[in-house]
């Protein structure tokens, strides 16, 4: 059984969002996203996969479809398959969040 301590994998890149794979199977993946201030994940979509964003630390503007909301620690949302989605760290603090996706694209 694979066990991951999140504190051991949080890593930032001053140039762009840092994404680290935590779990990756044929059907599912979970990544940790680490964003410095002003970094973002561009808005995009996955035709057949649902994606969940879960904020661990900091806050960020999350876009799903035509909605944009600020999510903070312990808040989450889902981007259903085919919906545009993305995130931007609009604050002066670091943002750490999980991204879950299934089925894997």
What are these regions (language model features)?
Residues 1-28, 42, 63, 77:
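A short, N-terminal "cap"/entry segment at the start of jelly-roll beta-barrel domains
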Residues 67-81:
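Short acidic-glycine-tyrosine-enriched beta hairpin
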Residues 31-46:
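Conserved short histidine dyad/triad with adjacent acidic residue
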Residues 82-105:
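Ligand-binding loop in jelly-roll beta-barrel domains
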Residues 28, 59, 67-69:
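Well-ordered beta-strand scaffold positions
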Residues 50, 55-60:
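Glycine- and acidic-residue-biased ligand/ion/polar-headgroup-sensing regions
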Residues 43, 62-63, 79, 85-91:
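Short beta-strand His + acidic residue motifs that chelate non-heme Fe in jelly-roll/DSBH
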Residues 17, 47-49:
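Compact, glycine-rich, soluble single-domain proteins
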